């Protein structure tokens, strides 16, 4: 990413707001519960979003449903990037990022020439065995005719799996059925659909399955 100093911000710096309220055309709440909050994020070519705030959760996962161009984030608050402009590089559909999360207040400018969509999952579970740096998983070409499960990353908090469901066949069952899961559909007419621990679908289909290994950081009521 490229970093540039943000020289001035004025009164807007202290007025972070709910993204679903101030940027509802771009941020779409799918669900939230004690384990996670999942959002669908969509931008058209060269669209912008006003200053908004993301909450302080320990970690977050980004699943890129489509290709996407560069984004420019102007950060007003947040550690350790207060006062910086960050340019996120272009991404490929199927790429995944598992990141350390922090409270952020920023505006957004999408620099791409084609629409883009990704899923943002803010994890509320205990952040066990955190990697030192963000985990970036590149897109992968998979054989749609053969059911398969690929373990892309695992630590004490999560397990990130790519799942291929062959035509007419149910998606492979989880080897850890007691772990709740967040499933994102990556192909077909339901591409971009996100579900909490859904029943097994039938192929042809590709999914990203995030299985949650640790308990919510805050006690469930």
Annotate each predicted stretch with a short phrase:
Residues 16-51, 73-172, 204-221:
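A short, N-terminal "cap"/entry segment at the start of jelly-roll beta-barrel domains
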Residues 53-56, 112, 175-177, 201:
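Short glycine/proline-enriched turns and hinge-like loops at secondary-structure junctions
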């Amino acid at each position: 990413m490229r970093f540039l100093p943000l020289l001035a911000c004025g009164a807007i710096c202290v007025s972070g707001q709910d993204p679903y309220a101030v940027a509802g055309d771009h941020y779409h709440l799918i669900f939230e519960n004690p384990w996670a909050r999942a959002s669908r994020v969509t931008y058209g070519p060269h669209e912008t979003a006003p200053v908004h705030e993301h909450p302080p959760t320990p970690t977050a996962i980004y699943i890129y449903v489509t290709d996407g161009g560069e984004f420019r984030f102007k950060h007003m608050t947040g550690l350790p990037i207060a006062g910086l402009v960050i340019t996120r590089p272009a991404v490929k559909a199927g790429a995944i990022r598992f990141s350390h999360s922090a409270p952020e207040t920023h505006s957004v400018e999408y620099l791409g020439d084609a629409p883009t969509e990704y899923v943002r999952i803010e994890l509320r579970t205990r952040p066990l065995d955190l990697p030192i740096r963000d985990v970036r998983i590149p897109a992968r070409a998979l054989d749609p005719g053969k059911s398969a499960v690929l373990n892309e990353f695992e630590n004490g908090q999560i397990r990130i799996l790519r799942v291929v469901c062959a035509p007419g066949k149910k998606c492979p069952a989880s080897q850890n059925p007691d772990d709740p899961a967040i499933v994102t559909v990556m192909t077909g007419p339901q591409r971009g659909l996100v579900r909490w621990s859904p029943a097994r679908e039938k192929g042809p289909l590709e999914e990203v399955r995030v299985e949650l290994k640790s308990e919510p950081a805050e006690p469930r009521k």
